[in-house]
């Protein structure tokens, strides 16, 4: 629940002649103890300033909306006139009506166009060490609470401004500590000064969240607390416009929208049209101050989970500010001039001011276009694809629930079938027509004719086509060995990411269904007390971590490599076994507890005997699991994003402990304490050898040969190849390919082929798609697979090869049949190598089971 700081006696609202705002409200310097730009404002100072302003001003309400992973407050200030504050609940209710104009009469609409202030949201410094966005937002808060000029009064009367100054307090404070520990009496603008210098690992730490996540890529998935706190705010207020204030490299001064290509086909025209108007206002503000700026370069909104693109798909004009960095307090630019933090924050402030003045002056036009855009979105949903369906039996129930819940959090209306329904014109999640299909009661239905239509389509369509003109330009850049400028992945369809079934239909007939009003949890059938064993659903990724938690409690647990049938019920490959026959009486309650914890489906059986020739529960087909001790390499030259994704997956999503080993510690650490060591993506084997030393890497190789399980992710696989632990070949190593152009796949979801006789594929859903985001091409050793050298997952080939997203022709020709996941036995140990990062952003949930199999079952596998 939001913690609210309501700050004024109501009588102050009705003073006939209020004192000047300047006399009532403290300045930023009076509270923080430094002027803007003198030091880096930390999260606690932001909190103190917001509360002090709210205590003194009738223009401000402050809310704490959550906490970061490290416990820092997530706060925003709601700024508007005292008169608007007196009717704030009505303004908020009217914002909902404008954001959902179904049932809004023309008369009521006209009244709201006349009375309703525009809602404007500002988010500062989502990348922690991009400092000026926070400072510029706080400076605007100071202006709006201490000044009474005509523009300020108009902004307060015609807008409600929500200023969220620090979107990423953990990253920001980490950088503030770095800088403040190293700065002298005066800021040193020398780029090599230690206050301005840091390693690539440190840079990502200061940019990202506690778990090394780029929160500016998390807006549709909401994996992080920071995102989870902000999404309800946007749903509650339905802003017409918003700003995401960033920094970029030092070579240029300022970027404002309109953005560059590509623009996706579902992107709202409302945002595109208003980009031009806001862009002109920004230009006028910068021209008046003589500030250099650029537009339509570098930054695009094709990917839907940037702050800006998410805002736009949610119905607002989501705008990006990119200020040239001052690194810390001052930095020397390539031309020899110095940019200070004060310079940078003034540019952010200037742009913010221009946007607010335009919003206040054009309030009615903005509201009219906003409502028209939502009516257009609803009308669009009444043609073409009419609805999307997530079948009740379409995969891991926990993953289905997560998709439904993230859609609901983003304002999407979801219904659930109360009776079986047959639909015509059905297309599956791969974009293939399946004609008519019947969906069971309990399936989830998302109708397209609703206000969040654009967001629904961009998240649930199998493919979001990249515009052809952009592809032609990108191809020319590839041929010149330049960056093609995709800027992010090109496939993110939720059914593909989460490994569940999904369908769309052109059938708009009425269905027997009921609105889903609350977050959903998978249904868990009760299970009887078992005499022999408890069997955990093999299709659920969390089943394997559940086994490890039960193993930790002292129970005997195992994993089925292949499916079986016991007492008339089928059990899939990957099914977990908890033996009850010789266990403590508490086993039933402990299994029930872990089932509740992970929303698992469990059955109790009174015999281990399988029907027919299926494997029984004591057969050689069963993998008896140990409780593995897991470590992961950390710091230089490990790629921090990859490290963070794996850490978050294990620590947060499955509550599994992992020890972090700094790469240089390979020379001295007692590796025998670990059963599994994870190597995330790396910056290069040369850096790895330099930091670990030849002796450290040899100790790692010896640990594998002595029985350890090494799990390598993406470029981390090069470590295993460098140490000659695996015979996996790179396509580019082949003599005939040595001069071939290296082309990357920009984040496509690619069809795969699973070796169902390999334990690594146990429990992995059918139709698994490999998220591919590199130019790596690995080939299995020549000759037939052997028990010691096997590819558990390869990219599909022939007619089965398919993908969502973009891929160049070279990749279409080279990728089929290449390795995605590979195992090689080395001495008494093994290497499990992934060609790509299987934990991508922790929202690639369809890959979880593969990763968990490797990490948790690898040490016990045959």
Features from the language model and the residues they span:
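Sec/Tat signal peptide C-region and signal peptidase I cleavage site
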Residues: 19-23
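Intrinsic-disorder/low-complexity accessory segments
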Residues: 24-131, 138-162, 211, 217-218, ...
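Bacterial N-terminal signal peptides
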Residues: 8-18
